[in-house]
Amino acid sequence: MSKKPPNRPGITFEIGARLEALDYLQKWYPSRIEKIDYEEGKMLVHFERWSHRYDEWIYWDSNRLRPLERPALRKEGLKDEEELFDFKAGEEVLARWTDCRYYPAKIEAINKEGTFTVQFYDGVIRCLKRMHIKAMPEDAKGQVKSQHPLSWCCPIDPAGSCNQSMGSEDWIALVKAAAAAAAKNKTGTKPRASANSNKEKERDGGKWFKLPSKKAETSTCIVTAEIEKKEELPTSSETFGLHIDTVPKIVFPQPESTLTNKRKNNQGNSFQAKRARLNKITGLLASKAVGVDGAERKEDCSATAPVLEQAISPKPQSQKKNEAVISSSANTQKPALLSSTLSSGKARSKKCKHESGESSGCIKTPKSPLAPELIQAKDLTLVSQLSSVINKTSSPQPVNPPRPCKHSERRRRSQRLATLPMPDDSLEKLSSSSSATDGKAFSISSQNQQQSSVPEVPAIAYVPLQKLGPCLPLDLSCGSEVTGSRTPHPSYHGGECPREEKEETPLFANPTSKVVSDVKGAAAATGISKTEKKVKLEEKTSTAFGKRKEKDKEKKEKRDKDHYKPKQKKKKKKKKKSKQHDYSDYEDSSLDFLERCSSPLTRSSGSSLAPRSTFTEKTTTYQYPRAILSVDLSGENLSDVEFLDDSSTESLLLSGDEYNQDFDSTNFEESQDEDDALNEIVRCICELDEENGFMIQCEECLCWQHSVCMGLLEDSIPEQYICYICRDPPGQRWSAKYRYDKEWLNNGRMYGLSFLKENYSHLNAKKIVSTHHLLADVYGVTEVLHGLQLKIGILKNKHHPDLHLWAYSGKRKDQDQAVAEAERKITPQDRANSEGKECVQNHKEPALRMEETYITSEHSYQKPQSFSQDCQSLTDPGSSDDDDASSFEEDGELRVPDKSHLLYKNRGVSEKNPASGNKVFVYNDKKGTEGPGDSHLQWQLNLLTHIENVQNEVTSRMDLIEKEVDVLESWLDFTGELEPPDPLARLPQLKRHLKQLLLDVGKVQQIATLCSV
């Protein structure tokens, strides 16, 4: 009786269906159903990209199975009666704003793609999907027009202007009422000063600064400051630097009783919170414009140029002397100059840094220029007109967020600004940012001066404003502290800053002396020609080089004199050697032929520099946040990856004097301190990237750890130290940790107990290595014989489908020549070619193409379609050595006659080329031209020739193995350790010894766990 699979949402119980399954290591992997057993109620699950040996039978109701894409079950219950409503144009609805709250709105149009163009009750037009619109209750439909008269009673005509039908007296009265209501709100309820309240206020307030647009909108982050304090300051239109004639006037046709009684209405309490916040902002803006003469009207603005929102910051009291200049410039501004102002402003603010955690709040800006009918040429709202007027007299400022200063002395990793090629507008950034540190947010008169000399400004390529990322906020209530908080303050360049800050920015070494206090001075700095800039930049960079060298010398002297600072352990980088085992001191000369070149798979310093080298192409003078620069390489979170400057090789190269002198190990360590200054990465278990106290370096990934965190002291550092990540790589199988534990395979050394005077593995290392080589040769021969059996089976079966793979005619090549050609194509590596001995050391060789020469491998039989997968398993760090037993382990045209040669390459053991005169087949691209009758015979002939060659290879290898066994036996007989071969008599003793050894190892493991150093 067959059982029916359970109903599990997202899982299809059929063969080939994909899902996620939990393996025995408690990790989820995408999987596939291979078989289904309806009787037992379980399925054979295959983990994708893993070998089939890990396929597992899992019950179909097990919690180890889950859908590949989790369905959102909560959305299925949201289907209510809302779908029954068919909205029409002009209908009043509740539309959702960006704060996920619903506010009254009116449908303007229904688009073809199923979206609705709605106008909110405050005049903002947005394009929303059907899911963001609700039907308005019947009892609330008639209340909206009387509650908020701003946009419902001032309809928007096609020209984009607001029809004003009443006099300015009602408007002034309404403004006073709004100001009184806002003041009453402030005294009644004390505003919260938390970041969340500021964020919420600016998010809702940002809707007022938004221009109507039917197009998609992007949100750029803004920086919030003490808005509450700024709101309480009594300001007027003079604070903005605007003439009294330039402030727009808006007529509100409803009396003030409508606005004051608005909060008492209980029927509209669902959107009462937003109205209160908007009234607060309205009252604030109204209090700033109370002194406006209501009889005068502002002349027509430019309806063609798009009004872009820029940073507006009121000037401090110390700058009131420039109000006359500012107001006159505001009157003389023409709409035709707006585009040139924006372009020059863009050129000055060419690079805008990403804020690293300082942004709190978002504001909406149009992604593209607005449609002409949506641009309000006259007075739609007060804020939009204020922004359009003040934007003509303002320009964006380059933003330089201060880097966080750390009190602890950190090692200099790079000097970016002093040596990188700086763009031409860097001096403009310098002048503008230094003036911003003095409290001046921006200068309008300097903008006028720049506009008057627009042709003289050098043509600097600039990034469009939409691509600048977070720009300065459009916030009328923010003061100069907002801009000041995002520019380098002089206190950040004091004594508590790290040394790298001073070295890399010599231009800002004394910012107080560089501050341009006069507005004309800042404008003059922006008008410097290219040649003067280049000359000054060359002088600055040359002085920066000199300063850096002097500081390097001072650092060296200070290190020698400072006896209290613990010496940091600097391990020498291991240089690749062609030989690690030297048997010259041994008495027996017959062991000389056992010399093999081992392949220590130590990662070179270049591999640790690989992620950094990708950033050297960028010549920008700013630093990305560390969160963006974090690179994940097999679990290594390189959070300190920074730019390398062009002079980084200067400290890495020894000068002529240092080349000639013979320096001891201490001098080498000191010089290596300078070499590794740019390469050091601190990756400790404590997750702090600071160098404190005694540091130890991993010999594989060259990362540094605190010895205290690792539980090691200065006198207990092992000879070979490998960090915790290299020993147990995250996201990989357990067997991956043996890649870095190669001492046992290469040198025959194992870790011993510290209380023992003699280590057995150290005393008998040569014997252990010879035994390892012997076992590797035997293992390689067994694999060759297995492949030979498969090929003999093909030869016996005339109708085997894979017999045609031997249809190529071949020519012979010397094996040494083939190996040499392959090594020329492989990445540069250390080779030791002496007397026919070959050594392949690099285990990360690129997998080359092997379409038609795969049959030269005599140890394995495989279809050609799986070449890419097998080669990928070699280069993939996530795959283990024993992932696929039948995989080829060849590299392109590397014609080595046994798999063990490349097997040793992967496992850290390399073998000598056993027979230098052997030949292998390298086939041509030509296919056989025989007829169909002779084809099978020719294929069998080619295969037979190949099998004979492989048998000859096996014979020569067996001779080599026999010699190795003879040498090993004579060696053991010479030392007296060879006992008569009676394994059956010693079997019980061997079992007892193995059992006791396991018990002892378990005790040692418990001791190490409980008694950590």
Curated annotation (Swiss-Prot):
What are the protein's GO molecular function terms? methylation-dependent protein binding; zinc ion binding
Stretches with biased composition (Basic and acidic residues) = 496-505, 533-565, 824-852
Tell me where in this chain the PTM N6-acetyllysine is found.
905
What PROSITE patterns does UniProt report for this protein, alphabetically? ZF_PHD_1
Assembly mode: Interacts with methylated DNMT1 (DNMT1K142me1). Interacts with SOX2.
Keywords (A to Z) from UniProt: Acetylation, Isopeptide bond, Metal-binding, Nucleus, Phosphoprotein, Repeat, Ubl conjugation, Zinc, Zinc-finger
Q: What is its main location?
A: nucleus
Source taxonomy lineage?
Eukaryota, Metazoa, Chordata, Craniata, Vertebrata
Domain Tudor: where? 11-71, 85-141
Task: Kindly provide the name given to this protein in its UniProt entry.
Answer: PHD finger protein 20-like protein 1
- Cross-link (Glycyl lysine isopeptide (Lys-Gly) (interchain with G-Cter in SUMO2)), chain numbering: 75, 79, 530
Q: Where is the composition biased (Low complexity)?
A: 443-453
**Which intervals of the chain are annotated as region Disordered?**
183-206, 309-368, 389-454, 482-511, 533-585, 824-911
Q: Per its database record, what is this protein's job?
A: Is a negative regulator of proteasomal degradation of a set of methylated proteins, including DNMT1 and SOX2. Involved in the maintainance of embryonic stem cells pluripotency, through the regulation of SOX2 levels.
Q: Where is the composition biased (Acidic residues)?
A: 879-892
Composition bias (Basic residues) maps to 404-415, 566-579
Q: State its location(s).
A: Nucleus
Q: Which organism is it from?
A: Mus musculus (Mouse)
